[in-house]
Curated annotation (Swiss-Prot):
Cofactor: [4Fe-4S] cluster
GO molecular function: 2-(3-amino-3-carboxypropyl)histidine synthase activity; 4 iron, 4 sulfur cluster binding; metal ion binding
Keyword Iron-sulfur in record: yes
Biased segments, Polar residues type: 1-15
Cystine pairs: none
Entry's Gene Ontology BP terms: protein histidyl modification to diphthamide
Manner of cofactor binding, per the entry note: Binds 1 [4Fe-4S] cluster per subunit. The cluster facilitates the reduction of the catalytic iron-sulfur cluster in the dph-1 subunit.
Gene3D superfamilies: Diphthamide synthesis DPH1/DPH2 domain 1, Diphthamide synthesis DPH1/DPH2 domain 3
UniProt key word Iron: yes
Protein name: 2-(3-amino-3-carboxypropyl)histidine synthase subunit 2
Protein purpose: Required for the first step of diphthamide biosynthesis, a post-translational modification of histidine which occurs in elongation factor 2. Dph-1 and dph-2 transfer a 3-amino-3-carboxypropyl (ACP) group from S-adenosyl-L-methionine (SAM) to a histidine residue, the reaction is assisted by a reduction system comprising dph-3 and a NADH-dependent reductase. Facilitates the reduction of the catalytic iron-sulfur cluster found in the dph-1 subunit.
Organism: Caenorhabditis elegans
PANTHER family the UniProt entry points to: 2-(3-AMINO-3-CARBOXYPROPYL)HISTIDINE SYNTHASE SUBUNIT 2, DIPHTHAMIDE BIOSYNTHESIS PROTEIN
A Pfam entry, by short name: Diphthamide_syn
Length: 476
């Protein structure tokens, strides 16, 4: 067991906050896989059979950065199973449009693929029905002996009656062995539950009691005090999202398969949830909302955009829909003078848990639902969710007080938020269109990203550019 300052797995940042560092700390763990392990890790036989059964002719193979070095070998192994079928073609997808945990159906569509094999960690968001998808999560050893040795050092600190075991996808095949060790080591008769990964067929047919692609243990559904045992990478997006969603997990013991140590600490979910409630108040105070589309491969994202437009309209707020691919601070800073609060529409692993580096607050779809839909209430406790599809069918109510000047009290500014009248809403409201001319940014002191070449004398007038081809433009 190791002791440290607030451990990395309690960070308020997810890979969405550091897109360039998304898998850097995990990459070395997957290096130098033996030849036999490549076949089993990438499920070559099962994948080939899936392609055969579906009679797919154009197949996209999507790899995260950590597994990209194996893409050529995996592609050749799969193609070798179909040498007699010249019509079958495979395409390697990397550097995905949004996040590597999501199905990149946009890139697959560019290659006119009818099937996609997703390798590596996945958020398990329900994909759209435009393409057939197979998930290959990989299988890595969890080092049972080292886990037993480390867990014996922290077992006495687990005091809750209920114990939940949660694992990153690539270790989930070891779940039963790890659960057996936990039951063996824990003193007394404790109730140990595993958050299992259901089969793909189950996920397609019924997602009830499923969260982040995993079955929700009964103790968490009933909000009972629970100790969490997590086996996964230090920068796993799964753990911080899970702890916010289930604050009844009072402590967490994190087994790191890289250095084979366990860290045990109390969670800070309640404090972090109160920060999310602060963001709800910021959105209530906002006049202009920017809906940032952070994924188009998740089912019902179009319905989510439509619902957000409707909620903003009823709340009397302007809304702009923005798509910038992978989000970062410089990209959103370009819109910070026009937008008061950004709402990020993304998969669960893409939720920004710490927006302190951004010029404007970045909230999740759940917080937007609480802020803009009077039918919803939330007190920074149980019920926070990173999955926007969970409440798309809920009713949107409109608060219309008898006195149109009446409003509610802002907990941030200390002022009363006045309910806008129908005339005010219809005058220059959410449905209005802002027209930007080429000189739109001229009067601003800050104009966004600067390449270091532009000058104050740069003209916004259109002129004739160069002609020709790259080999020799005119005027060279």
């Amino acid at each position: 067991m190791t002791e440290s300052a607030p451990s990395a797995f309690f960070t308020t940042s997810t890979p969405a906050d550091h897109v360039h560092e998304e898998e850097s700390s995990n990459t070395g763990y997957f290096e130098n896989l033996p030849e036999n392990d490549i076949h089993s890790f990438f499920e070559i036989d099962a994948t080939s059979e899936w392609i055969k059964q579906g009679n797919h002719q154009r197949i996209a193979l999507q790899f995260p950065d950590s597994l990209l070095p194996y893409s050529e070998k995996v592609t050749k192994l799969i193609e070798s199973r179909f040498r007699s079928e010249s019509a079958k073609k495979t395409f390697v997808l990397a550097d995905t449009s949004y996040r590597s945990c999501c199905v990149d159906e946009v890139a697959a569509a560019h290659a006119d693929c009818t099937a996609l094999v997703h390798f590596g960690e996945a958020c398990h968001s329900a994909p759209t029905d435009k393409i057939d998808v197979k998930y290959v999560l990989g299988s890595m050893p969890i080092f049972i002996d080292q886990f037993r040795m480390e867990f014996q050092n922290v077992a006495d600190q687990l005091t809750a009656e209920h114990i939940v075991l949660l694992m990153d996808s690539c270790f989930s095949h070891e779940q039963e062995k790890v659960a057996a060790v936990i039951k063996e080591v824990l003193p007394g008769n404790r109730h140990v539950e595993c958050s299992l990964l259901p089969s793909e067929d189950v996920l397609k047919q019924n997602r009830q009691n499923i969260y982040l692609g995993r079955e929700i243990p009964s103790c968490l559904r009933n909000n009972q005090p629970t100790d969490l045992i997590f086996c996964g990478f230090p920068n796993s997006p799964l753990l911080p999202i899970w702890l916010l969603s289930y604050p009844s997990c009072s402590t967490v013991s994190h087994f790191n398969p890289i250095n084979k140590t366990i860290q045990h600490e109390s969670t800070r979910s309640s404090r972090l949830l109160r920060k999310r409630l602060f963001l709800v108040e910021k959105l209530k105070d906002a006049d202009t909302v920017g809906l940032v589309v952070g994924s188009v491969g998740v089912d019902k994202h179009r319905e989510a955009v439509k619902r957000m437009r409707e909620m903003c309209k009823k709340a009397g707020k302007k809304i702009y829909v923005i798509s910038v691919g992978k989000i970062n601070v410089p990209k959103l800073s370009n819109f910070s003078t026009d937008i008061d609060v950004f709402v990020l529409l993304s998969c669960p692993f893409g939720v920004v848990l710490d927006s302190s580096d951004y010029f404007r607050p970045v909230v999740s779809y759940f917080e937007a639902e609480i802020a803009l839909n009077p039918a919803k209430t939330w007190a920074a406790d149980f019920g926070w969710s990173a999955e926007f599809a969970a409440f798309l069918e809920d009713k949107i109510e409109t608060e219309v007080p008898d006195d149109k000047a009446a409003g509610d009290f802002s907990l941030i500014s200390g002022k009363v938020r006045v309910q806008k009248t129908e005339e005010e809403k219809n005058g220059d409201g959410p449905s209005s269109v802002a027209i930007y001319n080429p000189g739109y940014c001229n009067d601003r002191t800050w104009k966004g990203l600067n390449d270091g070449v532009s000058t104050a004398e740069d003209s916004t007038k259109m002129g004739e550019g160069r002609s020709g081809i790259a080999q020799g433009y005119s005027g060279k």
